[in-house]
């Protein structure tokens, strides 16, 4: 019996127009009415989730969101932090040094800010900020490492070829010290070592006294793999890569074909 539904957002809950299909909203409400807990699990920062959560119309429910690829977990009753992992000043200095050696640009996130290091943000960073409804805040390395901010996650952004080059040159080294993932063609992410959506989901499930076997997780991208494998039932979207599909227990329709609703109807309702 499924007691917790863990949903990725981009490419899963959201269609290609970055909207939540009505079929998904309806199915989620039906699942919650059956007692299933909803946990949105996303690489987005919290401020990139809030407008969508409001659209779901779950104001009277206390659900959870896991953001920044597992770095922070919030309860929706007051949006307070219930669990988090953060980068140390030494971590930030290391990531900054990698960015300085490459053509990508480093960004950092705390609960409220989308920070940019190393000068004016490139066009790709600006586009990403627009997608998560955020202004950009330029910050110096000195201020970023001052301890004033709780920095959850770093992201390197550049063109696809620039990000290819960064990954080829530095991913092997970086992944010895951080949890790194190429989440999008133009983004390489770095979280505190051992941090994934799955680790955050595991800790939350323990708090809620829910077993992994009672969790259904859905996703489409590389940063969803650990979560799909952790859950008792891991569902890949029809728009996922063949590799992600091969690691899932089942494949549903795409995010353009109400894939989330179809899976909820099949396994929960």
Where are these regions (language model features)?
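Mg2+-dependent phosphoryl-transfer enzymes with acidic/Ser/Thr/Gly-rich catalytic loops
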Residues: 1-4, 21, 189-269
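Asp-based phosphoryl-transfer active-site loop
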Residues: 3-17
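Short, flexible loop segments at the rims of nucleotide/cofactor-binding pockets, characterized by
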Residues: 14-18, 43, 84-85, 229
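Active-site phosphate-binding/coordination module
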Residues: 22-123
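Hydrophobic packing residues within well-ordered alpha-helices of enzyme cores
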Residues: 24, 49-53, 166, 170, ...
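Short active-site oxyanion
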Residues: 35-39, 61-63, 153, 213-214, ...
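Short, structured coil segments at secondary-structure junctions
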Residues: 56, 61, 174-176, 230-231, ...
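Conserved acidic, metal-coordinating active-site core of Asp-based
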Residues: 98, 102-218
């Amino acid at each position: 019996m499924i007691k917790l539904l863990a949903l990725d957002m981009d490419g899963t809950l959201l269609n290609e127009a970055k909207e939540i299909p009505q079929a998904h909203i309806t199915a989620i409400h039906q699942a919650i009415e059956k007692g299933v807990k909803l946990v949105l699990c996303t690489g987005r920062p919290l401020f990139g989730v809030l407008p969508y959560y409001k659209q779901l119309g779950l104001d009277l429910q206390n659900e959870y969101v896991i953001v920044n690829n597992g770095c922070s977990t919030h309860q929706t009753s007051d949006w307070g932090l219930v669990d988090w992992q953060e980068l140390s000043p030494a971590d930030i200095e290391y990531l900054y040094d990698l960015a300085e050696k490459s053509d990508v640009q480093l960004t950092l996130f705390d609960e409220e800010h989308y920070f940019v290091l190393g000068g004016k943000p490139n066009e790709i960073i600006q586009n990403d900020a627009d997608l998560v409804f955020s202004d950009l805040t330029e910050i110096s390395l000195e201020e970023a490492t001052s301890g004033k901010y709780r920095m959850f996650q770093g992201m390197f952004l550049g063109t696809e070829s620039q990000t290819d080059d960064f990954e080829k040159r530095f991913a092997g080294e970086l992944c010895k010290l951080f949890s790194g993932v190429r989440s999008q063609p133009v983004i390489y992410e770095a979280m505190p070592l051992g941090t994934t959506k799955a680790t955050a989901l595991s800790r939350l499930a323990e708090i809620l006294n829910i077993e992994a076997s009672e969790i259904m997780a859905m996703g489409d991208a590389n940063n969803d793999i650990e979560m799909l494998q952790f859950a008792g039932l891991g569902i890949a979207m029809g728009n996922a890569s063949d590799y992600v599909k091969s690691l899932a227990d089942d494949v549903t329709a795409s995010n353009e074909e109400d894939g989330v609703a179809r899976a909820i109807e099949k396994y929960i309702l």
